[in-house]
Amino acid sequence: MAKFPLSKYASLEMNRAAYLKNGLVRSQTPLSDEFTAAAPCENGMWVDANIANQEIKLPAEGTVQYGIVYTTEKEWGRYVYGLKEHFDVAGAYPRVGILQSGDIFTTNCFDMGDFANLKAFEEAMKALDTTPLYVVPVAGDGRPKVTATKPTSGAYGQVVKYTTVPNGEKAIKYTILEA
């Protein structure tokens, strides 16, 4: 698997997120020790949001409540905006929305999964009308992977468009089909 290329850190645009209206937000639960400066928590990551754990963790086999990290980016300076600058490490308190069917996100936080390189991935994006692609959680990694295999169980989404995030970097838009 290969991480989608970014200029710095991942970003997230919430196109439709029911958790904002429904109050299904985790914001007073710290990140686990899994998140370090070398492997930080970024916007758009899927995490284990079960508060019974007393901390936000990377997904594992059997995760029952997936959340998506959507911590608000800050302005980092007069000409440097926070969209691709933001990350969190262990002990920080990110905002995490509980995924629900019908949510729609645009993000560059994903793994190219089934595709060997960016060229193969972009070719697959051109065929979305005829060959659907899906995003699925990966145990031990917050970046969901893109796959051509439709999941038969668990949380997953379907890629609907290859586009950009507001700072102009390439991204995918996907809708959650099962949460």
State what each model feature region is.
Residues 1-179:
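Surface-exposed, low-hydrophobicity beta-strand/loop segments enriched in small/polar/acidic residues
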